[in-house]
Amino acid sequence: MNKRDKALQLIKELEDNQDRPISPNLKENLENLTLLTEGCSDIVFRQFDFGNGLCGFIVYIEGIVKSEHIQDHALRPFLMHLTDQIDEHEEALQNTLSISSVALETSMSKVAASIIEGNAVLFADGHSKGLILNIKGGQRRSIEEPITESTIRGSREGFTESLRVNTALVRFRVKTFQLKMISFKIGTKTKTDVVLAYIDGLADPKVIDKAKKRIKKIKIDAVLESGYIEEFIEDDTYSPFPQLQYTERPDTVAAQLLEGRFAIFTDNTPFVLTGPITFWQLMQASEDYYERYLMSNLIRWLRYMFLFVALYLPAIYVAVITYHQDLMPTNLMFSVASAREPIPFPAIIEALIMEISFEALREAGVRLPKTIGQTVSILGALVIGTAAVEAGIVSAPMVIIVSLTGIASFTIPRFNLAISIRMLRFPLMFLASIFGIFGIMLGTIILVLHLCKLQSFGIPYLSGISPFKRDEVKDIFVRAPWWTMTRRPGTYSRGNGQKGAKREDPKDEENNI
């Protein structure tokens, strides 16, 4: 068996968690780890002589481990007085070493896994244990304002790619020992750290158990982003509607947890999943709860109005132009007819040309660098729209319709819902081109039936309206004043449903003076 085959066999043994013990022979341990890490130039081996005939080596990943801490907090104490304590309990080592976490391990597979996770491991000759030192470091992105969820009023902190930084940001906001965080490792190759967070006593135990089971059942070699987990654990993978919400905002996650939901943190991504969710939740922005309720209600009504525009306006235009011209006022009908006179295509083809062009421009604006992406989107839309009208490919009313539809889709606060609405426009346009208004009605019936059937971890997707819940209606189409929302949503929370909100009338204060 050549060296490569031996390395592959050793890797397979370690991935299958086969218990290969650490040898007391230092040379054998060094050979095994060297064979295991062959071709990994970022993994560093440093050999040392501790004196009194005792030799050893330390292994770590350069760039993840703080190399300056190795000398100060690991090797120097060993050279001074720890060489005789390596077989002692972790507590003795913990009390002597100035390192946050120290562990002794006898299994080579666990030692290898800890190296990959970013720990340093020290071996000494004649000792069948490896000393795992948690001295992780390296460069990570600092806390910044969320790019995808910026607000005028509210927290400026956003999640980063560091799992423990993200969980700490939530701990800062929810200061209770009832906030539980359960850790998982997913991915045979990546061994990605995943944390399920919930507030014990508020979250429904059945929902939490369901989330745990679904996470444990995930079998995959790599998890690089929370989207992997989302597709594995959602109720209906084939539905166009999202059944989990993702967010970059710690205040949003804290608010979801306090309502009895759970959050799933994934290492190496700033996006945290929350659930269960409803359709109405996807139409809410964090700023709705920071502004005065009258302003929040006005903006929320605008969102629902533009949701209707984003979904139905192109289909209604196609249906009216194709079958129901008599529904238009006479002057408008003549104006549209004169604009469409030189157009060689039916309304559905005209709509598809403009909608697909608009989607292409939107995608180009996202993928291009920020400095030119927005400019390309705006100028591209203006130039292409004007040129298409002048060339007689599309009519001016169609350009207006597509522009209004695009602007309306930007008012939807959650991107995963907005992209679903954009996708559903196309089947509605096809139905409108075949059956007219009746096709739109048919599509709407199918859509509503699907939404009524859809669930998120057993919670109805339209909960609050279907089934109707009086307490939850206060935060669907309107946001009632905080002092009237005295109970948590019963759909998600169990146990303590009281929020403790109470408001004293200022007039009573004046009377008491």
UniProtKB/Swiss-Prot annotation:
Pfam families: GerA. GO terms for cellular component: plasma membrane. One of its GO terms (biological process) is spore germination. InterPro entries: Spore_Ger, UPF0353/GerABKA_families. It is a multi-pass membrane protein. The keyword tRNA-binding does not apply. Keywords: Cell membrane, Membrane, Transmembrane, Transmembrane helix. Residues 501-513 have a biased composition (Basic and acidic residues). It is found in: Cell membrane. The chain crosses the membrane at residues 262-282, 304-324, 341-361, 382-402, 429-449. Residues 489-513 are annotated as: Disordered. Signal peptide: none annotated. Belongs to the GerABKA family. PANTHER family: LEUCINE ZIPPER PROTEIN 4 (PTHR22550:SF5), SPORE GERMINATION PROTEIN (PTHR22550). This is Uncharacterized membrane protein YfkQ. The lineage of its organism: Bacteria, Bacillati, Bacillota, Bacilli, Bacillales.
